[in-house]
């Protein structure tokens, strides 16, 4: 039998084996049988050493053509096997299009989002502007521009996440106020609220979190008085907690305001009679506020003899906890669907 006859017979046998392969594994075995290192086609190349030199190029070309033919047939058969497998799956996994579709879960706004939007809508109605700022902030705007120089003892009041010596995660949204006043270049009025996330090195527990939400407000203009602040806070308390709420101002200390006050609202659960929510005092602390310190105005470019202002800061987390009777602040951040589903029902009823 000549070499040509041997190649022709080998080709025919390879085509038969390829067509008889029913799956990918069988096809791989055929490939190894003919094209593997110890396969039949590779064996033909070993015979080349016995041929005269003038016959070797033609012989090598024919062996390569045989290899290419077998490889091409293998590729076609592999494609056909994949198609057959897919068609079989489709026939076995038929879908009854008349069956009802899967129930699609409809989400709702997060309770913190609802509370923040409620507060934003309230202040937009009062003519305030909403201003965003940087969460990664410069030490200057977070502290020094707010009357807290590097040597000020009040810096110990809030441990901070420092990235470098001069860059940190903001500990409050007050830097937005400082930057906004600086941009206005001493020209009033300024009437803004600054919502956003803030960061402090607190150990997480039922009432503390290393990350929480804060909304601060600022009004700067000529002839702004403490009575303007009190009237604003009374309106906010009634809108958030009920029309029959009263507020109480207690003297306090914040480096960036003077005078400074803590603001309490009469308990909406016991109507001031005393209960677990208000710790039997009849009052619930909701925010801090005060008249903008003259040093803060001056550092931002405002003449403190011509301009005055008030500022306040509130925590939507705490307000949401009070409004919805939530005992642990960590529930807001654990993404527990059982917890969040409760507020979908509130939203469906159109309640605030």
From Swiss-Prot:
This is Phenylalanine--tRNA ligase alpha subunit. Its cofactor is Mg(2+). It catalyses: tRNA(Phe) + L-phenylalanine + ATP = L-phenylalanyl-tRNA(Phe) + AMP + diphosphate + H(+). It comes from the Bacteria. Binds 2 magnesium ions per tetramer. Keywords: Aminoacyl-tRNA synthetase, ATP-binding, Cytoplasm, Ligase, Magnesium, Metal-binding, Nucleotide-binding, Protein biosynthesis. The keyword Metal-binding applies. Tetramer of two alpha and two beta subunits. The gene is pheS. It comes from Staphylococcus epidermidis (strain ATCC 12228 / FDA PCI 1200). It is found in: Cytoplasm. PROSITE patterns: AA_TRNA_LIGASE_II. Transmembrane segments: none annotated. Mg(2+) binds at residue 258.
């Amino acid at each position: 039998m000549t070499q040509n006859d041997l190649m022709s017979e080998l080709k025919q046998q390879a085509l038969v084996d390829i067509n008889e392969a029913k799956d990918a594994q069988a096809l791989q075995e055929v490939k190894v049988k003919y094209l593997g290192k110890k396969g039949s086609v590779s064996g033909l190349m070993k015979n080349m050493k016995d041929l005269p030199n003038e016959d070797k190029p033609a012989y090598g070309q024919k062996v390569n053509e045989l290899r290419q033919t077998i490889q091409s047939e293998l590729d076609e058969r592999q494609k056909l096997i994949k198609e057959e497998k897919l068609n079989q799956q489709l026939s076995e996994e038929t879908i009854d299009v008349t069956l009802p579709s899967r129930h699609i879960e409809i989400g709702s706004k997060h309770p913190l989002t609802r509370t923040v939007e409620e507060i934003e809508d309230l202040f937009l109605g009062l003519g305030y502007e909403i201003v965003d700022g940087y969460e990664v902030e410069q030490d200057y705007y977070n502290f020094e521009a707010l009357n807290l120089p590097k040597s000020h003892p009040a810096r110990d009041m809030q441990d901070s996440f420092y990235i470098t010596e001069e860059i940190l995660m903001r500990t409050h949204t007050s830097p937005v106020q400082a930057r906004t006043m600086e941009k206005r270049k001493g020209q009033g009025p300024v009437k803004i609220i600054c919502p956003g996330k803030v960061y402090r090195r607190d150990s997480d527990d039922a009432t503390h979190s290393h990350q929480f939400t804060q909304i601060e407000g600022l009004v700067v203009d000529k002839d702004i008085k403490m009575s303007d602040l009190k009237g604003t806070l009374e309106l906010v308390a009634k809108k958030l907690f009920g029309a029959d709420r009263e507020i109480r101002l207690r003297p306090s200390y914040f480096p960036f305001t003077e005078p400074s006050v803590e603001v309490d609202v009469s308990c909406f659960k016991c109507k001031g009679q005393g209960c677990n929510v208000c710790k039997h005092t009849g009052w619930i602390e909701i925010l801090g506020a005060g008249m903008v310190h003259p040093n803060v105005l001056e550092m931002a470019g405002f003449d403190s003899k011509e301009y005055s202002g008030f500022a306040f800061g509130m925590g939507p987390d705490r307000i949401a906890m009070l409004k919805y009777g939530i005992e642990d602040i960590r529930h807001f951040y654990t993404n527990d669907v059982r917890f969040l589903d409760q507020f979908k029902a509130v939203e469906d009823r159109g309640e605030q």
